[in-house]
Amino acid sequence: MIGTGIGAFGAASAAGSIIYSNFYLFCLSIFCVGILGGFAQLYRFAAADVATHEFKTKAVSLVMIGGIIAGFIGPTVASKAKDLIPNAEFAGSYLFVIIFHVLIVLILLKTRLPRPDDTEQKGKTRPLKEIFSQPKFLVAVLSAMAGYGVMAMVMTATPLAMTEESSHQFSDAAFVIQWHVVGMFAPAFFTGSLIHRYGPVPIIFTGILLNVLCIAINLAGTDVFNYWSSLILLGMGWNFMFVSGTTMVIETYSPAEKAIVQGVNDFLVFGTAAVSSLLAGVVQTSLGWRAVNLSSIPFLGVAVLALFWYIFRNAEKEGIFLVKQDSTA
């Protein structure tokens, strides 16, 4: 509720900043909107916390399904409402965002979650160094960071590349981003089942391959079809890497440790996304679309190295490439 209130304030002030042409207020407003994003990312952990052990993986995946609806509604509203207020392009879009925040509040008012018990509040915790040095935690965080880093880099630069470098229309860019978001969240219908059956490591590898294919298509051409198909693959690759990483993280902490572990995980993952988003604009405007895609490759390289290290360290112990087993690392 607190995060939603901050987000609503940010959306309202963003609309005002556009109307009055105040760039610094706009930056502050978007910062507030981003705070809501930080709160909203905890929904997946909340779902995992209340799910049974067997259902945790699917719970995380199912939370992501809401993004499919958002993938169609968000870009459509942004496009249709951007000229709602004369001489203030996109101010109307931000006013519509306030309506979404009201809907969030109404849903949260009807949601009942168990309060933290004594085990969570007073249970024994391990030293932070011991928690964060677990191989499973390290590989989970690095995989999610890589997936988000590539996604943020390429996705953020796409509208600029399409409209400025490739001379496509804004409507084309909105169409591509719309389907990218669908690619991000549509796999949620089956990602959880795949992870439950095969384990997270093979699914992370699949996500990496999808990202590599995305980059290859982007380097091959700049038609709308290239952008459209590559951004769908980018979204799917992100989903596989992010959901699998989250699944691995929730296996690395006790109830008393979950707050700090979840917080550190999200700080690292979304910190990477923030840095990638900033770099995307700089690289795109100074070096171009090809450089954006080539700059994404090191993220995937880090994830591959981390996974091979984890496999060689734990393959015999956990049977990583077999059907998923209940184990800890």
Annotate each predicted stretch with a short phrase.
Residues 5-20, 210-222:
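C-terminal ends and interior cores of transmembrane alpha-helices
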Residues 23-38, 226-240:
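Hydrophobic core of transmembrane alpha-helices in multi-pass small-molecule transporters
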Residues 23-25, 53, 62-109:
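Helix-loop-helix hairpin linking two adjacent transmembrane segments in secondary transporters
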Residues 98-118, 306-311:
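C-terminal membrane-cytosol helix-exit motif in multi-pass small-molecule transporters
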Residues 113-141, 325-329:
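Juxtamembrane intracellular "pre-TM" segments in multi-pass secondary transporters
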Residues 156-176:
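Short amphipathic helix-loop junctions that connect adjacent transmembrane helices
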